[in-house]
């Protein structure tokens, strides 16, 4: 147990950048993806909530279907919405269809959809 306590203490002292680098190294070492684990963990919770809300959906996922002709404008808008860095936003836009924002209220989802469409993107709400 002393070894585990030492590991916890060491991990707690990492900066955000160091923690991100550690995550990348562990993903490579173990051949896994942290994004896949988050999607799997979020899947059952979303599925259980969707059944009772069959009458009217209250939470939406804003999905970028395609960037359209104005990719740079769409990347700028994705950065503004998500707070992602330039490379991450570019990867998201180029990897479309991808979710831009998940579990948002209907009003916010409609607003985000309008922003992205104004920039030239094709957007879906799910």
Swiss-Prot record:
A cellular component annotation (GO) from this entry: cytosolic large ribosomal subunit
Residues spanning the signal sequence: none
GO terms, biological process: translation
The keyword Transmembrane helix is assigned to this record: no
Residue spans crossing the bilayer: none
The organism's place on the tree of life at top rank: Bacteria
Alphabetic keyword roster: Ribonucleoprotein, Ribosomal protein
SUPFAM superfamilies from the UniProt entry: ClpS-like, Ribosomal protein L7/12, oligomerisation (N-terminal) domain
GO MF terms, alphabetically ordered: mRNA binding; structural constituent of ribosome
InterPro entries: Ribosomal_bL12, Ribosomal_bL12_C, Ribosomal_bL12_C/ClpS-like, Ribosomal_bL12_oligo, Ribosomal_bL12_oligo_N_sf
Gene3D superfamilies in UniProt: 3.30.1390.10, Single helix bin
One Pfam family linked to the record: Ribosomal_L12
Known function: Forms part of the ribosomal stalk which helps the ribosome interact with GTP-bound translation factors. Is thus essential for accurate translation.
PANTHER family xrefs: 39S RIBOSOMAL PROTEIN L12 (PTHR45987), LARGE RIBOSOMAL SUBUNIT PROTEIN BL12M (PTHR45987:SF4)
Family membership noted in the UniProt record: Belongs to the bacterial ribosomal protein bL12 family.
Quaternary assembly: Homodimer. Part of the ribosomal stalk of the 50S ribosomal subunit. Forms a multimeric L10(L12)X complex, where L10 forms an elongated spine to which 2 to 4 L12 dimers bind in a sequential fashion. Binds GTP-bound translation factors.
Protein name in the entry: Large ribosomal subunit protein bL12
Organism name: Methylorubrum populi (strain ATCC BAA-705 / NCIMB 13946 / BJ001) (Methylobacterium populi)
